């Protein structure tokens, strides 16, 4: 599935299209974005939200979650077959925040899923528009990536918390399709596979019978997706071994963890897309922007341009720093949770600080939080420059290792050196090179040892002025090469608990 011959651009994955030319891709992505915008406007009308309330990111998230829940076929079916107390399987809802007499009031709303899906289809020319749904899932996933740490999840599967930069997309639902698979990090795929193998170890029937056959197909497909993310022959060969294993068990788990570690230096190809909150698209559509006619790209200037002239608000808790809240959302909008802070800061034109130094909690407000003390402020989502999003891990000239960047997975295609402590990483590889994958392991370790930290990734690539929409004159930034900029150092973020 993810073999070399079938590489499609993100936009094709995003819109389910086969090979199209750039104009067609831009138009179909534009159609998807326009549909989200029209849906959002309609929902604001239904809920009688004022202009200000419609620009509140928390309201946007509730509306996005409602439509995602309305179209979650498997969960809806499950809810109908296993009725739980106090949950109506046919309804969906969430908190809507309204500004009344200078105070923010939380109102819990409930809608028929039928009704929501009708409004969604109507906004999307009567189609299901799965691409638009996936797009919103990726925005939520990017927001989670920027907000929470996954240390516990990593440790539970036997991985190391230092592998956090490989965990992009770890909260994406399984149903997110090809576009979702493209944005998942190596660690996310490894974690999904390990969970599957562990179930097989504990449950004799997991791989058996008709269900087991389907499980097996899913397993092999996930292996192929992961294989497609690796860029060296040895890593790919090792994935073939894992995929072809008759009865996946601890040996495969070992191999997968080895591969995940190796991805700290031999980075995988992980796609990055700027997915914005629905209210941003709604604002643009409301102001008369025709996305389908103008065309749109998730990896170019368009999202930057959109954020330059959109005003979005957020609720702020009493001791949160609005500038920090803005940084969090900016990172989520550009899928930059795992990007080098030096690069992000340069593009944003403001210093981007590591998560451990942020005085802000997540964007969503829990139902037990006190609304009396809530304030709201404008999110500063503008940038100084724009840059093209990348789908490569930033290894210099493929097939040869370069010092990929530990604890960073590049988002922007911008030249930088990749400072990393090879000793720290290589220490993780002492010991086990026996077994049937020994020659591949030896080869992978050899490639990593020859990696040079002084290599430059994305040679000659730069950022662009916001007036330079055709990306004609790149500005290649020079970074202070000594310090590495991982967002996760000194981390004290909350865990993501589903």
Swiss-Prot record:
Chain span(s) of sequence motif Bipartite nuclear localization signal: 198-216
Subunit structure: Homomultimerizes to form the nucleocapsid. May bind host exportin-1/XPO1. Binds to viral genomic RNA. Protein-RNA contacts are mediated by a combination of electrostatic interactions between positively charged residues and the phosphate backbone and planar interactions between aromatic side chains and bases.
Family the UniProt entry places it in: Belongs to the influenza viruses nucleoprotein family.
Protein name: Nucleoprotein
Keywords: Capsid protein, Helical capsid protein, Host nucleus, Host-virus interaction, Ribonucleoprotein, RNA-binding, Viral nucleoprotein, Viral penetration into host nucleus, Virion, Virus entry into host cell
Short motif (Unconventional nuclear localization signal): ranges: 1-18
Primary location recorded for the protein, binned into one broad class: virion
Originating organism: Influenza A virus (strain A/Swine/Iowa/1976/1931 H1N1)
The UniProt record lists the keyword Ribonucleoprotein: yes
Subcellular location as annotated: Virion; Host nucleus
InterPro entries reported for this sequence: Flu_NP (IPR002141)
Positions of the UniProt region annotated as Disordered: 1-23
Gene Ontology biological process: symbiont entry into host cell; viral penetration into host nucleus
Post-translational modification, as annotated: Late in virus-infected cells, may be cleaved from a 56-kDa protein to a 53-kDa protein by a cellular caspase. This cleavage might be a marker for the onset of apoptosis in infected cells or have a specific function in virus host interaction.
MF terms in GO: RNA binding; structural molecule activity
Function comment: Encapsidates the negative strand viral RNA, protecting it from nucleases. The encapsidated genomic RNA is termed the ribonucleoprotein (RNP) and serves as template for transcription and replication. The RNP needs to be localized in the host nucleus to start an infectious cycle, but is too large to diffuse through the nuclear pore complex. NP comprises at least 2 nuclear localization signals that are responsible for the active RNP import into the nucleus through cellular importin alpha/beta pathway.
One GO CC term, this protein: host cell
Pfam family, one: Flu_NP
């Amino acid at each position: 599935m993810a073999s070399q011959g079938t590489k499609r651009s993100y936009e094709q994955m995003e819109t389910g299209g086969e090979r199209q030319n750039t104009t067609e891709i831009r138009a179909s992505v534009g159609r998807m974005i326009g549909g989200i915008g029209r849906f959002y406007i309609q929902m604001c009308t239904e809920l009688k939200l004022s202009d200000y309330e419609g620009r509140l990111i928390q309201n946007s998230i509730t509306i996005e979650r409602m439509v995602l829940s309305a179209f979650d076929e498997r969960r809806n079916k499950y809810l109908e077959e296993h009725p739980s107390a106090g949950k109506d399987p046919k309804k969906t809802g969430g908190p809507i925040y309204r500004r009344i007499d200078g105070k923010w009031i939380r109102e819990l709303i409930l809608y028929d899923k039928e009704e929501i899906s009708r409004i969604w289809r109507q906004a999307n020319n009567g189609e299901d528009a799965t691409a638009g749904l996936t797009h919103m899932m990726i925005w939520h996933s990017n927001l989670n990536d920027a907000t929470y740490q996954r240390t516990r999840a990593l440790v539970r599967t036997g991985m190391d918390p230092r592998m956090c930069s490989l965990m992009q997309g770890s909260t994406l639902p399984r149903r997110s399709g090809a576009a979702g698979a493209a944005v998942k990090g190596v660690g996310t795929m490894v974690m999904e596979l390990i969970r599957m193998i562990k179930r097989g170890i504990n449950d004799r029937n997991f791989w058996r019978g008709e269900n087991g056959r389907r499980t097996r197909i899913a397993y092999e497909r996930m292996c192929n997706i992961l294989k497609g993310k690796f860029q060296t022959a040895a890593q790919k060969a090792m994935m073939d071994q894992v995929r072809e294993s008759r009865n996946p068990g601890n040996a495969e788990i070992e191999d997968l963890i080895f591969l995940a570690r190796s991805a700290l230096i031999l980075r995988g190809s992980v796609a990055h897309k700027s997915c914005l909150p629905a209210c941003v698209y709604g604002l643009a559509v409301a102001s008369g922007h025709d996305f389908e006619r103008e065309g749109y790209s998730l990896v170019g200037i368009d999202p930057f341009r959109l954020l330059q002239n959109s005003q979005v608000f957020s609720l702020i808790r009493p001791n949160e720093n609005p500038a920090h809240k803005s940084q969090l959302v900016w990172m989520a909008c550009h899928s930059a949770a795992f990007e080098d802070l030096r690069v992000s800061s340069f593009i944003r034109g403001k210093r981007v600080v590591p998560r451990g130094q942020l005085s802000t909690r997540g964007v969503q407000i829990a139902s037990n939080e006190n609304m009396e003390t809530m304030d709201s402020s404008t999110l500063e989502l503008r940038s100084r420059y724009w840059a093209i999003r990348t789908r490569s891990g930033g290894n210099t000239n493929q097939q040869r290792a370069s010092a990929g960047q530990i604890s960073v997975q590049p988002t922007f295609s911008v030249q930088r050196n990749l400072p990393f402590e090879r000793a720290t990483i290589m220490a993780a590889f002492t010991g086990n090179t026996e077994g049937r994958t020994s020659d591949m392991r030896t080869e992978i370790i050899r490639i990593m040892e020859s990696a040079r930290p002084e290599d430059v990734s994305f040679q000659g690539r730069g950022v662009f002025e916001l007036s330079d929409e055709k990306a004609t004159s790149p500005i290649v930034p020079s970074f202070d090469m000594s310090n590495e900029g991982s967002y996760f150092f000194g981390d004290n973020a909350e865990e993501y608990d589903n």
